[in-house]
Design a protein with these regions (language model features):
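Conserved alpha/beta cores of soluble small-molecule-handling proteins
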Residues: 1-131
Length: 131
């Protein structure tokens, strides 16, 4: 089993804790690029972003948790992918492919595996995809 970071897992609360990696993909000329894991936790967006001016954004929230046998589970990521796609469609934003959404989540979880609390602590790694 992968070693976890040294935190008081039973008293985490729900505040932001920076992890190692996140996934970023850009949409340009009608298509999504391949996306990649990045270590930078600062979002670099245009001053003309509709998220800033009009609040146009979509987000989801899901959890990764460790099982008794040490394996890691995601709670219904396919349903998160479908909701995210519906949100994007309703907001007239380009839909991120649902299969890629789930794969990107898995990639982020693997890269941040040591941030997932040990089994029995009641904690989980909260993942917040956004567009």
């Amino acid at each position: 089993m992968t070693k976890t970071v040294d935190l008081d897992w039973k008293n985490l609360g729900f505040s932001y804790i920076k992890t190692d990696c996140r996934y970023i993909s850009y949409y340009k000329d009608g298509e999504w690029d391949n996306g990649a894991l990045v270590e930078d936790n600062v979002l670099h967006i245009s001053e003309a972003s509709t998220a800033i001016h009009y609040g146009q954004q979509a987000f989801e929230g899901l959890k990764a948790y460790r099982c008794k046998d040490g394996s890691i589970n995601l709670f219904r990521p396919d349903q998160n992918a479908a909701r995210f796609a519906r949100s994007c469609t309703r907001l007239l934003m380009p839909e991120f492919p649902q299969e890629r959404f789930v794969e990107a989540i898995k990639e982020v979880v693997r890269a941040n595996e040591h941030w997932i609390p040990p089994y029995g602590t009641g904690g989980s790694l909260y993942i917040r995809p956004l567009m």
